[in-house]
């Protein structure tokens, strides 16, 4: 039994259509190459996918341009165009293009002079009115852009100010915590000294109870002064003695 005839129609499913296109394209390229080699034929094949991807084949060593030029000559298209254009068609086209570019350049220069206000003596009232409107629109756009940039700068300054304030607060809290910690360490050290002195006093308390004078400070200022006035010198020489005692 032979194969049944397959109906050729567009494949609706995108994935199936893409897979079929890839397979059939490979088969078509293979058949084209075989035909070119077996039959020594010059073949040019151009295929565009639905997404615009180009696939082409041309019989080596020819290029696609050479094959297309041969096709155009075989169809008689190129001679007809040359006969209709004439030998000076290229020169005329270049002259027209240069003229058009000169006119555009001149118009641009005139418009620039008008925008700058350099030469307005030849400008009509209607043109001046239109120019004024254009300048107003341009000025409004410039002002809007300027305000937008100023707003962005203000937002940046606010963010910077917020970050600096946050850093200052963090630094302040850090300094305060360090100061409190140092103060706590000093107070703890002072308490340790007081506790040490109290322990020493408690250790010396039995001795102080047994010897009341133990631990008292002796100051030279509290000692009784010697009575130097109760003593006087006695002369030992006879001539210095009292005459009444001699008699």
UniProtKB/Swiss-Prot annotation:
Keywords: DNA-binding, Nucleus, Transcription, Transcription regulation. Residues 1-61 form the MADS-box domain. One of its GO terms (molecular function) is RNA polymerase II transcription regulatory region sequence-specific DNA binding. The keyword Transcription applies. One of its GO terms (cellular component) is nucleus. Expressed exclusively in a few inner cell layers of the inner integuments of the ovules. Residues 91-183 form the K-box domain. It is found in: Nucleus. Coiled coil: none annotated. The keyword DNA-binding applies. SUPFAM superfamilies: SRF-like (SSF55455). It comes from the Eukaryota. GO terms for biological process: positive regulation of transcription by RNA polymerase II. Probable transcription factor. This is MADS-box protein defh21. It comes from Antirrhinum majus.
